[in-house]
Regions:
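Aliphatic-rich helix starts adjacent to a transmembrane/signal segment
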Residues: 2, 21-22, 26-33, 38-72
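Generic anion/oxyanion-binding catalytic loop in active/binding sites
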Residues: 13, 46, 208
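Short, conserved structural patches
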Residues: 2-10, 62-231
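N-terminal leader/signal peptides at the extreme start of proteins
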Residues: 1-23
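Residue-level detector of functional hotspots within protein domains
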Residues: 16, 28, 33-35, 40, ...
Length: 231
């Protein structure tokens, strides 16, 4: 009986030694902590890069709006519309909202063509983009690309809104619009976080850290000379 008990103890001793063995625990603990530390540090770096891109987008939009108010309108109608001939006003008479109702012309690009459209346009006003306007649109995109090289024409929208400024017979455009530049559908793609946390799936099976679509960035200024030549 004593021999059997001794044999049982002898058989369990390797298991007990294994459960009490502490060799290698430091390496395991280091590996676990290092992964979390690595994700934390590079997560901070990537979010810092995202905020830098966010601020760059805001600044680029403001720069583009500043350029747009000093350039030919993308919509050729602002150059051709006459407060005298089309609205029946006397030379020098202000073009108020009572004379010409508020309207907005929106210009965008599909990557090939620049198009402008609007609703409630006054009689005699054509929203279509002209040659000078297409140059302006391209220049606006180029201005944004100085800070954000990955931006394309499809990300940019230029709007012109009649807000009751201008006068008949004014040099340049009779109507002085509020010019708005919008930067849309700008995305920031995560790299490090996507690698380490990509196993966490969001709706549709996409990695939750894959990318973030930023909100639209908008900058508006009242039109100035609206003439690239400065005349």
């Amino acid at each position: 009986m004593k021999n059997a008990t001794s044999a049982n103890r002898s058989g369990l001793s390797p298991l007990r030694r294994l459960t009490r063995d502490r060799f290698g625990t430091t390496a395991i603990e280091f590996a676990l902590v290092f992964v979390l530390f690595f994700v934390f540090v590079f997560g901070i770096i990537e979010y810092a890069l995202m905020m830098w891109r966010w601020n760059s987008a805001e600044t680029a939009t403001q720069m583009a709006a500043r350029l747009a108010v000093q350039s030919d309108p993308v919509s050729g109608g602002f150059n051709s519309y006459s407060g005298v001939a089309d609205a029946g006003l006397g030379p020098g008479q202000s073009i108020t909202l009572a004379d010409v109702a508020a309207f907005t012309v929106t210009c965008s690009s599909d990557g090939t063509d620049v198009t402008c459209s609007g609703s409630g346009l006054p009689a005699g006003f054509s929203a279509a983009a002209d040659a000078e306007g297409i140059v302006t649109f391209d220049n606006v995109v180029t201005e944004i690309q100085k800070l954000l090289p990955t931006v394309t024409e499809q990300n940019v929208i230029v709007e012109y809104s009649h807000i009751g400024l201008g006068f008949a017979g004014r040099p340049g455009t009779d109507i002085v619009p509020l010019v708005t530049v919008r930067l849309t559908n700008l995305q920031f793609d995560f790299i490090i976080l996507d690698i380490f946390l990509g196993v966490l799936r969001g709706p549709g099976g996409a990695p939750v850290t894959d990318s973030i679509t930023m909100p639209a960035f908008t900058a508006s200024l009242t039109g100035e000379d609206l003439d690239t030549s400065g005349i």
